[in-house]
Amino acid sequence: MDKILNEFTGVIRRAVDDYNMIEEGDKIAVGVSGGKDSLLLLLALHHLQSYYPKHFDLEAITIELGFEGMDFTPVAELCRELDIPYTCLKTDIKEVVFDVRKEDNPCSLCAKMRRGALNDAIRQRGINKLALGHHFDDAVETFMLSLLFEGRLSCFRPVTYLDRSGVTQIRPMIYAGELKISNLAQELQLPVVENPCPQDKGSKRYEIKQLLNTMSAQYPDMKSKVFGAMQRMPLPGWETVDGRMPRGK
C-alpha cells in the first residue's frame, strides 16, 4: 500500500509545504465522510506522517448524519489497522434538514450543521487542525459556482483559520485531481460508504460538475486554465508562504 501511495502523497506534500499546512506538534483530525476523498486523504496523511520532518498527531472523525443504511464499520476497521484513533458521532442532522425544517436548499443547512458538529468534537479533543478532502476539481467547481450564481470571484482557501472555534482548516488535496483520486481509491480498495442523500445529484454543485465535465471533453485543459487563473489573481489566501506561484496539480 505504501508503494502505491508514494506518488500521491508527494502531491499532498507539495500543497502542505506550499501553504505551511502542518506545523510541529499539530493535532490533526481528518473529517471522514466515508467517501473516497476523505478516506484517501486519511491514508495519505498517515503515510506522510511516517517521514515528514514535522511531527503531528492524526485521528479521524465521522459525523453520521442519520441516513439509513450507512455503515461505517469498515472505516473503523481501516483506522484500527492503521492505528489511527477514530470517532463516529451520531447526529439527527438528516431529520432536522429534511423532516423538521423541510429545506428548499438542504445542502447549505446540512453543511452548516456538519461543520458545527465537527467543530464541537474537535474542541472537546484539543485538536487544532481539521483536514478536509476538497480537491482540485472541487476548487474549480466552487470558483465557477461563485462566478455563475453569485457574480463573485471566490473560492475556499487552502488554509482557513476559524476565529470562533480556534481551529484551522487545511485542504491538503487541492493539487490532486478527482480522476486520480477515484482510480487510486479503487486500486487500494478503500471501504467507501455510499451517500444515500437524495440531494447528492440534485444540487447546483452537481450541475456545475456536469457542465465542466462536458466542456472538458472538448477543451481538455479547461479546468487547469481556470485553476491557473485562480492562482494568478491570486484569490485571497492562495498566496504561497514564500510568495512563489503555486504549482498546481
Language-model regions: role of each:
Residues 57-58, 137-217:
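Catalytic subdomain that performs nucleotidyl-dependent activation
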Residues 13, 17, 46, 213-216, ...:
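A short, amphipathic alpha-helical segment
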Residues 111-123, 159-165, 212, 216-231:
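Short, basic, helix/turn surface patches
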Residues 221-249:
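A short, charged, Gly/Pro-tolerant segment at domain boundaries
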Residues 1-141, 145, 149-152, 179-187:
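ATP-dependent adenylation/nucleotidyltransferase module used to activate substrates
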Residues 65, 199, 230:
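Glycine-rich beta-alpha junction loops
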Residues 5, 111, 201-204, 208, ...:
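Generic structural signal for well-ordered, non-membrane alpha-helical segments
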Residues 21, 201, 216-220, 235:
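Alpha-helix boundary/capping and short turn/kink residues
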